[in-house]
Amino acid sequence: MFKIRSIAVRLILAISLTVAVACAILGTFSIAQQRSLTQLALDQQLKLQYDSVIAAIDYEGRAALAVSSVVAALPPVADAVARDDRDGLAALLDGAMKALTAQGIPLITFQKPPAVVVYRVHAPKVFGEDISSRRSTVVEAIKTGKQIVGVEPGREALSIFGMTPITRDGKIVANADVGAAFGKEFVDRAKKRFGIDLAVHSYDGKAFKKLSS
């Protein structure tokens, strides 16, 4: 059996083995550290993207809520809604509807308790249905008298809504419901404003459907 008798050779081998083990440990640690840093960077980027999307939704919701606040505070609007005067509402709001649509806010609807549509400025011939089954925020706004912002299914598509109850003599008589489409226009504005890549999907209980990207 071969034996190493030289102390110098033994020392060199021992040092070499120690260095090799140390390099292996450091290499393993370096790879793990690199993976950890990469994952951290990805997590931070995902959070940044998520925060940007939430900020975009919040921005659109605040804009819709601001419009609903103004509309609900107009005495002629409150009077027309109370009388179910759709022609009067059209005369008051048709011009504003065109301007708002150009700004990405294409939906204005008025509902009476519990959530019966009185008039849609954007679709004046469609009214009278109870939307409480799909618009819980409308029911809540009329019930509590509080302003609400939320994302819910509209008549044709998912939208971001801001709503303000309309009161007369201290009683809630209706709800001013203003919506920003949660579709291509929203995606385009979010991409431009925050510099993010974004797609919107909806879930119908069985599968996801892409709405816009």
Walk through the language-model features, giving the residues of each:
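Short, Lys/Arg-rich, polar N-terminal cytosolic tail immediately upstream
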Residues: 1-5
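Juxtamembrane extracytoplasmic/periplasmic/luminal helical "stalk" adjacent to the first N-terminal
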Residues: 7-13, 18-87, 95-106, 113, ...
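Generic structural signal of hydrophobic/aromatic residues within well-ordered alpha-helices
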Residues: 38, 77, 93, 138, ...
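Short, active-site-adjacent cap segments at secondary-structure transitions
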Residues: 116-118, 206-209
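Extracytoplasmic/periplasmic ligand-binding sensor domains
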Residues: 174, 207-213
